A protein has these predicted regions:
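Long, contiguous domain-sized segments
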Residues: 1-62, 67-69, 153-603
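Short, conserved acidic/polar surface loops in the N-terminal third of protein domains
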Residues: 87-91, 202-205
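Short hydrophobic beta-strand that contains or immediately precedes a catalytic carboxylate
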Residues: 76-79
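Compact, glycine/acidic-enriched structural inserts
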Residues: 14, 18, 102-164
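Amphipathic alpha-helical scaffolding segments
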Residues: 92-104, 209-213, 395-397
Length: 603
């Protein structure tokens, strides 16, 4: 046997053994998952397939849909995005686009009818940006959390920035905001997005010290740090009680109270009575650095240092103006702004943190617009390796005593693998099925063990997602068990924006007490014995939109697949334009690399 044959044969044996270990571990974990399901987890599974087979239950859900949307025709828009980065010898081009598919669901007939609509000729079918950034200015766009000494050249610096993914998020959020903000006659009542909104919300909390946009002109004034604090205090909803008075961000609660009081001062007694926090604790919180930038205490009254409503209005205007220049006017200089550096004015490119801040503004504006216009906002994530349900949510609820302390063996590695393994083994489950919703705040909470004691802590220190804002769940929309090996679609991840008209009964759930984070008041949707109409409506609508016409995306809503088609089609067209852009640099010898010049001379 030759050396090459021995190498290949050794690799084959190693691969075979690794595969055997993987399959044995997966089979063992799947058996543990089934036992956990039989002992407890079955209480968190909702068999919507059986519910929807009951005509009486379907009529109740349709009645709730009519009551919520105030119509029997539900216009929707599905939004997906795409992005890329194309490196050339002197510059890199970032491309980002978002594409929307419009349609309507008619619930007058059973089964409901689905109709797609074409965009009118005077509307853009997409939102596109292509931004060429020279390597000479790479220092502005690099992410500030990496070690520069480990990067070889400017091209790798920009590669690490991942600014194109931030631009794609900005495009998707802006398109959704535009759709929600449109005329009340034509605006959708259901917005579907192909991303996890709760994850985006968490990722945009980058820290005030890393945002360089402060100083950017807004009309006759400039954006200040305190404007950023007002942005992160939003969204406001008094019926949902958000923002809450969590220990590390109580100033946001005060900003909401003063805004709801039309900018008038609020006395400390009102704070104490409304939040059940002692006066000493409030005084201590109001003397923190961020709080002192926003408010001041005078004669037991809390006075705003500036107009919070005007500040929020200006921040939204900045988001709208920059996005209009970037995505509609295709102005690459929309991402360039003046900064003062050592007493002189220079122009710099926006960093990923700056764009994340714009995404934070847009997402909060989108949320408040959806509440104002009674729009259901759903986001779908296809691929995720997270364990927010099995580790974070169940772990924290077990520690607080809400869920029983049932011994559990090793489970499959991710939430999706856990639930898909259960769906394969439990014949009684019929699609669609879903787990009970849980508050997105559990994404940032987990249980740690310290000195033999279990402590509930934040995953990112004291940065915790806003509770009572998004409800997360996992669901499956296609599972056919005709053969021994079932034909099934992947479990997908669903985020639903909470709405006071649907979710008020679930706001008085168990409190989570933490010495580091204070008291957290999440929404709690109970077990499958509780009827959650918000989730029932969203799953029913998604089931109507999941036609299973395309085998490559079976069990996935068709409008989002069509939006993905549209986004990829736009990308293919723009790719040709971008690749042709280097022609302008070929006539400039100084811009060409030594290797390029040498290789071009054939001798």
């Amino acid at each position: 046997m030759s050396i090459i044959s021995r190498i290949f044969n050794t690799y084959k044996e190693s691969l075979k053994k690794s595969l055997e270990r993987y399959e044995n571990a997966y089979a063992s974990n799947a058996q543990n998952a089934l036992q956990f399901y039989e002992k407890f987890l079955n209480r968190l599974f909702i068999d919507y397939g059986s519910i929807y087979s009951n005509s009486h239950m379907v009529n109740q859900i349709i009645s709730k849909i009519e009551e919520y949307f105030q119509k029997r025709e539900i216009p929707f828009v599905a939004i997906d995005g795409t992005c890329s980065r194309d490196p050339f010898s002197d510059f890199m081009v970032f491309f980002a686009a978002a594409y929307g598919v419009k349609g309507s669901i008619y619930i007058e007939t059973q089964p409901p009818k689905l109709r797609y609509e074409k965009w009118s000729m005077d509307q853009d079918v997409s939102i596109v940006a292509y931004v060429p950034i020279p390597y000479a200015e790479a220092g502005d766009v690099i992410d500030s959390n990496y070690r520069e000494e480990f990067v070889v050249d400017d091209r790798n610096k920009i590669n690490l920035s991942n600014i194109h993914t931030r631009l794609m998020q900005l495009a998707e959020i802006y398109l959704a905001y535009q759709m929600a903000k449109g005329s009340t006659i034509a605006n959708p009542k259901l917005i579907l997005m192909d991303l996890s909104l709760s994850s985006v919300l968490m990722s945009t909390d980058v820290g005030m010290e890393r945002i360089h946009l402060f100083g950017h002109p807004i009309g006759t004034r400039t954006l200040n740090k305190r404007d950023g604090l007002v942005v992160y205090a939003h969204p406001f909803n008094s019926k949902l009680g958000i923002p809450t008075c969590k220990k590390y961000r109580r100033w946001a609660y005060v900003v909401r109270l003063i805004t709801e009081n039309e900018g008038k001062p609020v006395d400390i007694d009102t704070l104490v009575s409304s939040a059940c926090i002692s006066e000493n604790e409030w005084v201590k919180s109001l003397h923190e650095p961020y709080a002192k930038e926003l408010v001041s205490i005078q004669n037991r009254e809390i006075h705003p240092n500036f107009d919070f409503s005007a500040s929020w209005f200006d921040a939204v205007r900045l988001f709208e103006d920059l996005c209009d220049r970037l995505f509609h006017k295709r102005d690459p200089e929309a991402l360039i702004y003046p900064v003062r550096d050592n007493g002189t004015i220079r122009y710099r490119w926006m960093s990923p943190e700056d764009i994340a801040f714009l995404v934070a503004i847009g997402l909060r504006a989108l949320i408040e617009t959806c509440w104002e216009r009674n729009i259901m906002l759903l986001s779908i994530a296809k691929d995720s390796t997270t364990k927010y349900f099995s580790k974070n949510y169940i772990g924290v609820m077990r520690e607080t005593g809400v869920f029983p302390q049932i011994p559990v063996g090793y489970l499959p590695w991710t939430d999706r693998a856990l639930l898909e393994s259960i769906a394969c083994q439990v014949d009684e489950l019929s699609c669609p099925w879903a787990i009970t919703e849980f508050d997105s705040v559990f994404m940032t909470l987990h249980v740690e063990e310290e000195n033999g004691q279990k402590i509930i802590r934040g995953v990112r220190g004291n940065v915790v997602n806003q509770e009572r804002l998004f409800a997360r769940s996992l669901a499956q929309f296609f599972n056919r068990k005709i053969k021994a090996t079932p034909l099934m679609g992947h479990v997908i991840f669903i985020d639903r924006l909470l709405d006071p008209t649907l979710d008020a009964p679930f706001l008085n759930g168990p409190e989570i007490l933490s010495s580091e984070l204070g008291t957290i008041h999440p929404a709690y949707f109970g077990t499958n014995e509780s009827m959650n109409y918000g989730q029932a409506i969203s799953i029913w609508l998604l089931d109507v939109l999941t036609r299973n016409l395309f085998p490559e995306v079976i069990g996935y809503p068709d409008p989002l697949h069509k939006a993905d088609w549209g986004a990829k089609s736009v990308k293919r067209r723009v790719d040709k334009l971008i690749k042709s852009s280097e022609i302008a640099f070929r006539s400039r010898p100084l811009s060409r690399l030594f290797r390029t010049i040498r290789d071009s001379r054939r001798r």
